[in-house]
UniProtKB/Swiss-Prot annotation:
Post-translational modification: Palmitoylated by the ZDHHC9-GOLGA7 complex. Depalmitoylated by abhd17a, abhd17b and abhd17c. A continuous cycle of de- and re-palmitoylation regulates rapid exchange between plasma membrane and Golgi.
Residue segments, region Hypervariable region: 165-184
Catalytic activities: GTP + H2O = GDP + phosphate + H(+)
Naturally occurring in which organism (per UniProt): Danio rerio (Zebrafish)
Family matches, as SMART domains: RAB (SM00175), RAS (SM00173), RHO (SM00174)
Entry EC no(s): 3.6.5.2
Subcellular location: Cell membrane; Golgi apparatus membrane
Protein name per Swiss-Prot or TrEMBL: GTPase NRas
Any one of the GO BP annotations: Ras protein signal transduction
Keywords annotated in UniProt: Cell membrane, Golgi apparatus, GTP-binding, Hydrolase, Lipoprotein, Membrane, Methylation, Nucleotide-binding, Palmitate, Prenylation
Gene Ontology CC terms: Golgi membrane; plasma membrane
Chief localisation class: membrane
Binding site for GTP: 10-17, 57-61, 116-119
Broad class of enzyme this protein falls into: hydrolase
Length: 188
């Protein structure tokens, strides 16, 4: 069974834990209890493949920012979550993305932009979020942990992005092994 290490990042209070718990336990948590760090595991079937999702739900509060580098190093893919009723959390997405790219030392990291709390009045327009995602070259999903709208879609889209990334890396590794005549070469 293939395992995927997913990390949920974003500002405090955007609903990262609520999204994760809704996926794992089919339950909406409506009271806000700031997370330091929680880990969850769930077996799911995505596109016919049985997968084990290892999900790290992270602290959004600034006082825990020193821990971010560590979990960003181990994550394979990232849900960058903002609240559609909080423009500051939308602006903060850029900071999380830049930190992920720095820690991973790559511009090419599997990531999905998630606009959460879509069941409430918005201050961030859907078009703004779509344009930001397009500029980053990533997918955008709107979610509501309360109604469960888009929750599976967000996590499953990230798994598909990780699969795509793994295949791309595997193919580029295979290409490097090929000589100019199409003969496999290995350096001893």
């Amino acid at each position: 069974m293939t395992e995927y290490k997913l990390v949920v990042v974003g500002a405090g209070g955007v609903g990262k834990s609520a999204l994760t718990i809704q996926l794992i336990q089919n339950h909406f948590v409506d009271e806000y209890d700031p997370t330091i760090e929680d880990s969850y595991r769930k077996q799911v079937v995505i596109d016919g493949e049985t997968c084990l999702l290892d999900i790290l739900d992270t602290a959004g509060q600034e006082e825990y920012s020193a821990m971010r580098d560590q979990y960003m190093r181990t994550g394979e893919g990232f849900l960058c979550v903002f609240a559609i009723n909080n423009s500051k959390s939308f602006a903060d997405v850029h900071l999380y993305r830049e930190q992920i790219k720095r820690v991973k030392d790559s511009d090419d990291v599997p990531m999905v932009l998630v606009g959460n709390i879509c069941d409430l009045a918005r201050t961030v327009d859907t078009k703004q979020a779509q344009e930001l995602a397009r500029s980053y070259g990533i997918e955008f999903v709107e979610t509501s942990a309360k109604t469960r709208q888009g929750v599976e879609d967000a996590f499953y889209t990230l798994v598909r992005e990780i699969r795509h990334y793994r295949m791309k890396k595997l193919n580029s590794r295979e290409d490097r092994k090929q000589g100019c005549l199409g003969v496999s070469c290995e350096v001893m």
